[in-house]
Amino acid sequence: MILLIDNYDSFTYNLYQYFGTFTNDIKVVRNDKITIEEIEKMNPEKIVLSPGPKAPKDAGICMEVVKHFMDKKPILGICLGHQCIGEALGGTVSYAKAIFHGKQSKIEHDGTGIFQGIPSPIKVARYHSLAVQNEDLPNCLKVIAKTADGEIMAMQHKEYPVIGLQFHPESIYTEHGKRIIENFVNTF
């Protein structure tokens, strides 16, 4: 079962539909309606932290989920979920170099893991004004995709299957978005 933690975002059910293409066992729970103990009892195979408004400190249980489950379950964070991973592991989240709401950017990626079989560069959909800051990226994380101006668009834990995507793979404006989701489902 994939647990999709909803950060009160309008894109959550787009993600649900994309994941539903590859698995029929998905449970959606709001970020303030579940505890670590309840997640342990559910015993999900994977955890997804959805996009959402505001900042990581406002994302309910998400940062606690990263800290508790990072060495136990594959975790994918998208947009706010990505920022939660960065901050939970010691990074800094602050204003992005530019505000991107409903805009497309070209990114370069490393072609491994979640990007396996996907050409580089690709165009992705961005809806954010905050970003994980490159200069404060914890040593346990590596950048696996970025924009031409160096903004982090994807990062991965060096030891555990914890991946953050600043962009929205579930948006029609993201090239190969379904393949990115499929790679997470099948690779991690």
Regions found by a protein language model. Give the residues of each.
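Structural signature of beta-strand start/N-cap positions in the alpha/beta core
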Residues: 1, 24-25, 45, 74-76, ...
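Short amphipathic alpha-helix with an adjacent loop that forms part of the alpha/beta core around
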Residues: 35-43
